[in-house]
């Protein structure tokens, strides 16, 4: 009998290094909760919102908090059903995407959407990291690593405004989120390294579709206004105000369709996990 294909060999994870990298990711996400406090007026000006319309900018902060809190029970349950490292890396990827969308935002709707995506990714890092601690340490030795995770989360919340002030002193507010994205990419590589390798095989189809979709979305967000608005079918509409949305133009819609297709492809491959009846309960608790 011919033996089946062998699974790729994974190194044993390095518990302390993995805890350190995951804890830094948790601190980064926690810092992002309030990193925008001092940058709020600059961000409003960057997306064409005047200081007299401050109430319209509150979703920049509350949107992040909403995503952060709502995803906690869902990610906690997903971490029970599949690889903890896989969930952690997925949340880091979502956080990076949200940071890039926020950095490229040219109107309030896109900015708020980017912050919500950031919150979803950042909030998911907490239960995923706690699940990793439960896997790597026996019950009688979990007190210290769990305390470290809780401490760095609070430390990140305290340092967020200070880090934002330091960056604003030397750069534009968008660099806050570009550095977030860069830090997320570096932490992803470190988690893969310290966690023993990639916890799954990347499939070429959905990966290529996601890369193309994100590239088109990036072009739509970063392109000159003439490319996204001065074209046929580029109807301007934004539910947040009178500004023109670059996502509701042909190039923006194409990027959304491609990215959504990649997401649906991935969901189809994860249908066994998604079929679990109690997963719906976790979603309802989060909402």
Protein language model regions, located:
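Transmembrane-helix bundle of Major Facilitator Superfamily
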Residues: 2-195
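Hydrophobic transmembrane-helix bundles of small-molecule transporters
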Residues: 174-287
């Amino acid at each position: 009998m011919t033996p089946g294909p062998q699974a790729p060999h994974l190194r044993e994870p390095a518990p302390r290094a993995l805890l350190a990298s995951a804890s830094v990711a948790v601190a980064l996400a926690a810092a992002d909760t309030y990193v925008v406090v001092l940058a709020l007026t600059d961000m409003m000006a960057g997306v064409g919102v005047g200081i007299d319309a401050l109430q319209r900018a509150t979703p920049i902060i509350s949107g992040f908090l909403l995503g952060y809190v709502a995803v906690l029970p869902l990610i906690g349950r997903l971490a029970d059903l599949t690889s903890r490292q896989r969930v952690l890396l997925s949340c880091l990827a979502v956080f990076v995407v949200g940071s890039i969308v926020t950095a490229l935002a040219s109107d309030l709707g896109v900015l708020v959407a980017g912050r919500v995506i950031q919150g979803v990714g950042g909030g998911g890092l907490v239960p995923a990291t706690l699940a990793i601690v439960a896997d790597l340490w026996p019950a009688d030795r979990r007190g210290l690593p769990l305390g470290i995770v809780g401490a760095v989360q609070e430390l990140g919340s305290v340092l967020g405004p200070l880090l934002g002030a330091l960056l604003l002193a030397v750069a534009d507010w968008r660099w806050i989120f570009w550095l977030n994205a860069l830090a997320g990419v570096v932490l992803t590589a470190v988690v893969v390294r310290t966690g023993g390798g990639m916890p799954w095989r990347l499939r070429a189809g959905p990966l290529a579709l996601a890369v193309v979709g994100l590239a088109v979305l990036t072009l739509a967000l970063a392109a000159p206004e003439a490319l996204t608005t001065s074209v046929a079918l580029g109807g301007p509409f934004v539910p947040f105000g009178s500004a023109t949305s670059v996502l509701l133009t042909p190039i923006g819609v194409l990027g959304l369709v491609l990215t959504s297709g990649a997401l649906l492809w991935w969901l189809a491959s994860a249908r066994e996990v998604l079929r679990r009846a109690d997963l719906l309960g976790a979603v309802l608790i989060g909402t």
